[in-house]
Every structure is written in C-alpha cells, then in structure tokens.
From Swiss-Prot:
UniProt function note: The primary product of this enzyme is 4,2',4',6'-tetrahydroxychalcone (also termed naringenin-chalcone or chalcone) which can under specific conditions spontaneously isomerize into naringenin.
Biological or metabolic pathway of the protein: Secondary metabolite biosynthesis; flavonoid biosynthesis
Domain of life: Eukaryota
Catalytic activity, reaction form: (E)-4-coumaroyl-CoA + 3 malonyl-CoA + 3 H(+) = 2',4,4',6'-tetrahydroxychalcone + 3 CO2 + 4 CoA
Protein name: Chalcone synthase LF2
InterPro entries reported in the protein's UniProt record: Chalcone/stilbene_synt_C, Chalcone/stilbene_synt_N, Chalcone/stilbene_synthase_AS, Polyketide_synthase_type-III, Thiolase-like
The gene coding this protein: CHS-LF2
EC number of the protein: 2.3.1.74
C-alpha cells in the first residue's frame, strides 16, 4: 500500500520553478506620446478645454513615455462615441471588444513563447490567464485554450481585476504550480487593452487623466517549469515570492467596474507609499540570502509611472543603470498593467545577451521583480539569473 507521504513526494518537483521562454506582443496601432494630447482632445471633442489640455500635455511630457500601442483606433472611437465622453454608459460595447481582443492578443504572445520554448504545446499542463480588461464566462483562459488548441484537460486559472501588481502574482502562482506538480509546464498570459479604461477628460477628476497619459496595450506570455530537460533553455529561476499590503494605503489606487467602463482613481502620494515600503520588502526577501546591497542585484520594477521609479531610486540610493530595463519598457510601451514586468524580463535577458554579459540578469546572479497596484499591494519575487552561453562567432 502506498502512503500519502510517498504520493506527495512523487508529486513534487526537485528543483526550483524556472522561466523557460518569454513572448511579448502589442496591437499594431502605435501612438506617439508627443502628439497624443492633440489627438486625445480632438477625438474626445474637448478642444475647447484649453487649460485642461495644457495640463494633459504637461502630464504626457513628464511621463517619460515615447510611444504606446492601443487597440482603440480613431475609427473604433468614431464608431463608439460613448467611449469618448467622461461618464457615458458604455460597458456593453467595451465588453464586446475586450472579450474578443484580450484572448486574441494573449494568443499571439503565447504562440511566441511556445515557439521559443520549442516543445509541443501538448506538454502544457496549466494555464494562468490574467487581465483587468473585460470579464466573461467561460473566461479568457477558456478562449485561449481553444485558440491555441490546448488539451481539454489543461488546468486553468483565471485572474480578473488584479491590476498593476499582477505580473508578480502570476509568477508566484506559477512557481507554486510548477514546484508542486512534477513535470508541470505552466503557460502564463497577461493581456491588457485600454478599451475598458479609455474615456474623455474631466476637470474634476485629474487622476483619471493621469491614467489616460500612462496606460498602453500589450500582452506577455511566459512558460514556467521545474527541472528543465536538456532541450529546454532556462532564463531565470523563481527563488521566492511574497505579497504584502502597504500599511495605511487603503484607497491609494482603486478601479471600479461600472456602466461607464472601468474607472481609475489614484492618490497623489502613491510614489511615496511605494518608496516608503519597498525597503522592508527587500529586506524580508533578501535577508535569508545575506544580501543587503540593493545595487548588487538586477531590478525589474513595475513602471507605474516615472515618479514611482524616481522615488524608489532615491530612497534606496540606486545607481541610474539599475532601472534601465524598467525605464526602457515604460518609454517604449507605457504602463501595460500586469504585462509590464514580463516585458521587462524579456528586455533584460535580450539586452544582457546582446551586451555579452555573463548572465541573463545583466551579468549579476540575484535579482528582484516588483509589482505595485491596487490595495496598495506589493508583489516581491526573488529571481536567480542563468549563465549565458556564448553563441558561435
């Protein structure tokens, strides 16, 4: 007779969860940040609000964003004028777009990750799908499974309405799934489009306007598994993962799904809430490893906005190059909510390889990945890089 302990031991992987492939994708429609205020105020019939437009122009200029990608084109917005008002009932029309386009964009990212992974998709045992854009039953996890032609017995987990910290959450969940199910290969997909949050400007709700200046569309997919086979190419190991609520931060970042879509609320002190709590998170994550020099690790931080990055850098005394990959993704794509940190992981391993550095983490051994979002919730993931094998010259 087999004991429960023996079954349990046989179910568990031996090594740590490892990222085996990363895929990223954006919609084709690209918007230039420098000309976006003109476009935004024109398309929302708000050009008469000259002072507000000047404020928005300053927000865009300070955003450190060069360009963003958006599924919502001028044509779609002209067909849906309610999207362009500040508070017009429009949820049905927004949902109709989101429930189709979110899984579709996710599928493209997943196909890219599966191609890099190089293994048959039949080996995918779990799917974790994450979005803050649109809700349906069965969900985007089901749609993705159908679009990719995955096994009907794939184990699915659907995460809705988590927001900007969720890129850390999905890695934490994938780590537990991979390490507790021997041979598991977990496909994570974060797919975000601004169709639920786009709206016209309001003089009385400047926090909503901040969102219009920052958010962009994108999807990222990651394959996670423990005990890689010789045919698989490890990129990063997931060493530990934690989630915490920052004290006294209730209401700092809120989103509410209403008839008008997803409304976004942000308090001015979000950057200070994050920067005041980040050192405690770092200490708890790295103290067991004997690491206390925050410049000795590589950094992947959710780029909520430039003020958050500036204050974190200042508070921890980080060298400017520590947040290079993070700032690069913010500049090239804007804030894509949960997908951002996965884009930064992709950027970091590619830049590390191109620069001839020794590891996937900018030549360093240990790293940290942070997600910040509603709650205020902080996700902290400790990463271990993988040596980069020099390619043929």
């Amino acid at each position: 007779m087999v004991t429960v302990e023996e079954v349990r031991k046989a179910q568990r992987a031996e090594g740590p969860a490892t990222i085996l492939a990363i895929g990223t994708v954006t919609p084709a429609n690209c918007v230039n940040q420098s000309t976006y205020p003109d476009y935004y105020f024109r398309i929302t019939n708000s050009e008469h609000k000259t002072e507000l437009k000047e404020k928005f122009q300053r927000m865009c200029d300070k955003s450190m964003i060069t360009k963003r990608y958006m599924h919502l084109t001028e044509e779609i917005l002209k067909e849906n004028p309610s999207f362009c008002e500040y508070m017009a009932p429009s949820l049905d029309a927004r949902q109709d777009i989101a429930v189709v386009e979110v899984p579709k964009l996710g599928k493209e990212a997943a196909q890219s990750a599966i191609k890099e992974w190089g293994q048959p998709k039949s080996k995918i045992t779990h799917v974790v799908f994450c979005t803050t854009s649109g809700v349906d039953m069965p969900g985007a996890d089901y749609q993705l499974t159908k679009l990719l032609g995955l096994s009907p017995s794939v184990k699915r987990l659907m995460m809705y309405q988590q927001g900007c910290f969720a890129g850390g959450t999905v890695l934490r969940l994938a780590k537990d799934l991979a390490e507790n199910n021997k041979g598991a290969r977990v496909l994570i997909v974060c797919s975000e489009i601004t169709v639920v949050t786009f709206r016209g400007p309001s003089e009385t709700h400047l926090d909503s306007l901040v969102g219009q200046a920052l958010f962009g569309d994108g999807a990222a997919a990651v394959i996670v598994g423990a005990d890689p086979t010789p045919a698989e190419k490890p990129l990063f190991q997931l060493v530990s993962a934690a989630q915490t609520l920052a004290p006294d931060s209730c209401g700092a970042i809120d989103g509410h799904l209403r008839e008008v879509g997803l409304t976004f609320h942000l308090l001015k002190d979000v950057p200070s809430v994050v920067s005041n709590n980040i050192e405690k998170c770092l200490f708890e994550a790295f103290n067991p490893l004997g690491i206390s020099d925050w410049n000795s690790v590589f950094w992947i931080a959710h780029p909520g906005g430039p003020a958050i990055l500036d204050q974190v850098e200042d508070k921890l005394g980080l060298k400017p190059e520590k947040l290079r990959a993070t700032r690069h993704v913010l500049s090239e794509y804007g804030n894509m909510s949960s997908a951002c940190v996965l884009f930064i992981l992709d950027e970091m391993r590619k830049a590390s390889s191109n620069a001839g550095l020794g590891t996937t983490g900018e030549g360093l051994e240990w790293g940290v990945l942070f997600g910040f979002g509603p709650g205020l919730t902080i996700e902290t993931v400790v990463l271990h890089s993988v040596p980069i094998k020099p390619g043929p010259h």
